[in-house]
Amino acid sequence: PQFRSSAASDVYKRQTQQSKNSNVSSALDTSHLKVKFPFKAKYGNFINGKFVEPKSGKYFDNVSPINNEKICSVARSNEKDVEAALDAAHAAFVEWGKTDITTRSNILYKIADVLEKNLNLLATAECLDNGKPIRECMAADLPLVIDHWRYFAGVIRAEEGSVAEISNSQYSYNIPEPLGVVGQIVPWNFPLLMATWKLAPALAAGNC
């Protein structure tokens, strides 16, 4: 992989449109990955299965740390957006919390399959957004993301309740139950992997 900072030559910055079409960014050579630019021009908040405008109507620039290129605009959210997301999660939990373990496991496996199918694209997006080497995204971050989804898809199948005899007239039993709606703040170290660390086990356990 090749990286060029904001100090790249003017000649490189004025590369032809044909050359630009072979790469997703002037800072990153991804021609060998055969992927298109992974971002749309603007993103709202993903709530209840679709992108929606932020309540404030405001957006901010998402800039790649590789060379300070703007890669897209992102919703500037506030507490009203959080409330909307919480409402959607509580509504989804009514059904998801009652979904049987086999179904939850199969859905997690499908998520892993989709991630694996789009590994090159997601690794490119992670690299541009995060600034880390594309080879690290390709060889470490994304494979670990996929593996975590499959791991928890398997683990949940082995989760069972238990009964313990305390005395000849007393028994103790436990039944795993989802907590409900949970939240997560994702730092910038490796966003997709850190999100997966929390999302996969939470969804596997029936939380939203």
Model-derived features: positions:
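Single conserved hydrophobic/aromatic residue that forms the stacking wall/gate
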Residues: P1-Y12
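Conserved strand-loop elements at the edges of beta-sheets that form or border functional pockets
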Residues: S5, P54, S64, R76, ...
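Hydrophobic face of amphipathic alpha-helices that form TPR/SEL1-like repeat modules
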Residues: K13-I66
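Residue-level signature of catalytic and energy-coupling elements of molecular machines
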Residues: G49, N68, R104, W149, ...
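Conserved small-residue-rich beta-alpha loop and adjacent elements
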Residues: S162-C208
